[in-house]
């Protein structure tokens, strides 16, 4: 991991951009976090729209988390932002747009090719590097982003102890079987009137999760209408499980 820039934000948070091989990312840590008392880490997921476009939302989440005593980090997803375009990813994106415009079912192969084989190993590599930093310790949580990535990470990455998932992206049927293997505590957000999300599929997915502790928080409104207090509830969830 190579840090390429550093700045202190107004809220007493240290923001550092880094690269891990070809993977760009950002790390936020409370300035008060000493190496002698490493802080828990939350991995911030986001849609595959690029870090530059998502930065305002990501930094807002990071500042809120820092106020609660957490470090946070995020990485650029494969084929997004300034990263090189992968032919298989570009083809999957094209297939996804075509299927959605035609109202056709989005098959599992499209979503799997779009994100999972590349994104999950990269998140794990980032976690390896982040946990080597003296100011960061466990436990580790995962928050938001593409729900399929969160599900896969919850299954294959034992260092993730709790997750906040946003049921606002398409989930291939194959992920339902993986959802049954998830056992960590879950806090799931659902926008009830999300026009781009199959509400019943989201409810079925929640039912499929194998976690003994799981809660579903549904709010009226569309995809971008998540109320502020929903974030407060998610913060309390992480404080309960990571502190």
Feature map (PLM): residue ranges:
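Catalytic active-site module of serine/aspartate enzymes centered on a nucleophile-bearing elbow/loop
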Residues: 220-221, 226-243
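Serine-hydrolase catalytic machinery in alpha/beta-hydrolase-like enzymes
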Residues: 42-132
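Short beta-strand/loop motif that positions the catalytic acidic residue
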Residues: 182, 188-190
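Conserved alpha/beta-hydrolase "acid-adjacent" motif
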Residues: 174, 195-201
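N-terminal cap/lid segment of alpha/beta-hydrolase-fold proteins
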Residues: 1-40
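Acidic catalytic loop of the alpha/beta-hydrolase fold
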Residues: 192-197, 224-225
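Catalytic histidine neighborhood in serine/cysteine hydrolases
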Residues: 202-203, 207-225
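Primarily recognizes the serine-hydrolase "nucleophile elbow" in alpha/beta-hydrolase
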Residues: 117, 121-181
């Amino acid at each position: 991991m190579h840090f390429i820039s550093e700045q202190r934000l107004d809220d007493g948070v240290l923001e550092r951009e880094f690269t891990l091989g070809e993977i760009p990312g950002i790390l936020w840590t409370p300035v008060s976090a000493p190496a002698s008392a490493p802080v828990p880490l939350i991995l911030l997921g986001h849609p595959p729209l690029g870090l530059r476009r998502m930065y305002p939302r990501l930094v807002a989440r990071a500042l809120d988390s820092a106020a609660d005593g957490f470090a946070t980090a995020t990485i650029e997803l494969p084929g997004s932002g300034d990263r090189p375009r992968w032919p298989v990813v570009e083809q999957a994106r094209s297939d996804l747009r075509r299927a959605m415009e035609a109202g056709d079912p989005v098959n599992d192969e499209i979503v799997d090719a779009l994100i999972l084989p590349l994104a999950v190993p990269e998140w794990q590599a980032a976690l390896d590097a982040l946990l080597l930093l003296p100011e960061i310790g466990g436990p580790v949580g995962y928050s938001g982003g593409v729900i399929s990535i969160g599900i896969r990470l919850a299954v294959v990455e034992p260092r993730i102890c709790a997750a906040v998932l946003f049921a606002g992206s398409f989930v291939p049927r194959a992920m339902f079987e993986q959802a049954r293997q998830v056992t960590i505590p879950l806090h799931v957000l659902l926008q009830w009137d999300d026009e781009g999300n199959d509400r019943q599929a989201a409810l079925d997915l929640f039912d499929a999760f194998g976690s003994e502790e799981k809660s579903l928080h549904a709010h009226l409104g569309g995809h971008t209408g998540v109320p502020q207090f929903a974030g407060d509830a998610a913060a309390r969830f992480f404080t309960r499980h990571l502190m």
